[in-house]
From Swiss-Prot:
Lineage, top ranks: Eukaryota, Fungi, Dikarya, Ascomycota, Saccharomycotina
Gene Ontology biological process terms in this record: positive regulation of translation; translation
Top-level class of the enzyme under EC nomenclature: hydrolase
Disulfide feature: none
Entries under PANTHER family matching the protein: TRANSLATION FACTOR GUF1, MITOCHONDRIAL, TRANSLATION FACTOR GUF1-RELATED
Recorded catalytic activity of this chain's protein: GTP + H2O = GDP + phosphate + H(+)
Entry protein name: Translation factor GUF1, mitochondrial
Organism: Candida albicans (strain SC5314 / ATCC MYA-2876)
Subcellular location: Mitochondrion inner membrane
Family, as annotated: Belongs to the TRAFAC class translation factor GTPase superfamily. Classic translation factor GTPase family. LepA subfamily.
Amino acid sequence: MLLRPNSGNTLKYGCLLTKRWLTTSKLLYSVEDMKIKIGQEQYRKALEERIDKIPIENYRNFSIVAHVDHGKSTLSDRLLEMTGVIKPGSKSQVLDKLDVERERGITVKAQTVSMFYNDGKQDYLLHLVDTPGHVDFRAEVSRSYASCGGALLLVDASQGVQAQTVANFYLAYSMGLKLIPIINKIDLDSANIPGAREQIETTFELDPNECIPVSAKTGLNVEQIIPSVIKNIPSPVCDVNKPLRALLVDSWHDPYVGVVMLVHIVDGRMKKGMKILSAHTNRTYDVKEVGIMYPDRTPTSFIKAGQVAYIIPGMKNPREALVGDTFYQMGKHEGLEPLPGFEEPKPMVFVGAFPADGKEFNAMDDQMQNLVLNDRSVTLEQETSNALGLGWRLGFLGSLHASVFKERLEKEYGAKIILTAPTVPYKIIYKNGEEKIVTNPDDFPDNQKHHDVESYMEPYVEAIMTVPNEYVGNVMTLCLNNRGEQKEIEYLTTGQVLLKYEIPTSQLVEDFFGKLKGCTKGYASLDYEEAGYRKSDIVKMQLCVNGEPQDALTTVIHRSQAQARGKEYVTRFKKFLSYQLFEVAIQAKINNKVVARETIKAKRKDVTQRLHAADISRYKKLLERQKEGKKQMKLSGRVTIKNDAYQAFLRRED
């Protein structure tokens, strides 16, 4: 039986570092209360003593699988309140550290928090690993799942199973995680609990009787979750007596202490002062600090097998922190195998980035480098554009990743930036057997080099969409217009349909999700995963103004879309160009062949306004001279295009 603060019993350090909701609704001491009551140093010792006494059999590592806006962060907050990690009513979305995560309601970086729970008989140490739900951050998701024994499968009672839920379920299931179905938002008038149970049974083949209906917002039934976690999720398979092996789950850069790494200790122990070795870079580091997230960094003397904790390794360059890497203790690593799952992040969307004001390049370069320090999945190279000047070629995991990066740059540094249209990595196979990946449309082979190429290949994704039944026809038409191929259709309930299509990645990054939302009145959801490369008839299209290619507007498209896309480009770009004293031709070209053209007529001065009406010969002479002058001007004149025109075009303004 847990002691309450007002009972007459003696308070023993380490016994009351938790609280849980009781039938009387009286709470035990929270983390903040205990720090104040017994002091920081005694609190730390009590914490270490408590951790050391808990056997690994009483550890539970779990995650939450959910679609965006199904209440994952709110449920996390309730669990933290229930276990005394935070006070009730404190700031929401505790695990979302970045401003952009709070504002968008998404998780970008994997986070963890440790929780203590006592069932009245014994202590348990729980690690909740909060993972990004979006496919762009799938590397963090898979590494996080690797450190868990199970997951809560969260489904919105009013919306039912959605695309992201399905995609993350399959990932969790393939990694052997034990899944506990949770139906959230049962307090809503639109909640359909029987319908949600039916979807969980038909889509995931889980027992509907095991579903726990809760309201994360009000806390209703949330107290049933942790006992279910303890009962159903297995303890981690690890051995504290074996040599150290730690899996790197995620990392971030702290301006004061450098790189902070989130690790899952699979075997052994790690403590401050230990020298550790990276399995993949072969670099060594001296551990400056270890501890648990409770909910923020809380230093301890050691961390041991089974824990998901943080370390500060004294790493200077954050790009050395490779997600999925294994760390050993130096001198005790002979014969040890790295933990499975290491994978270098592969950017799938590339954009050109340029400062709105060219004079700001140097200052923005420093800001860009600082932001990349905290996200090693972003690739960064300097490039030069004839149209926009000095800039960068950035590689991202997906279009959401690119959007989040741009938003962070603007909000954290106040930077104004121009992003070119997103492109994907195309594979070119030459006749001599050489293969090349092209990420910049300007580097795509033109007419002169075309004869050396055996074939062109473009990446595809398998898109998973859930839509209301009445919009299925609209979605099928949208997928067909975007060169999609139907793979599967499944009726989840009478009202919801799950569609699987294989779609070119290039079509997906061109606001496919926005179009999907538009044709379903916002009711559709989307997730996707890579589906490899396919041979494709893709071509480079250049936008030329008076014969001069505008490299910032060069794009790679499928030949079947060339004419329609070319017409759209020249018509739209014409709106942003000012009139000149000579005729301006705007052309879309493929292999030097014009596929679309628009013309801006020359500004014309009335040179005959002062002539007498009867002076025909003089009238003709002046018009002829003007015509000749404009001809010369067209040959030698250059069209000056302001940055505003490029910005407006790339923002797709009308």
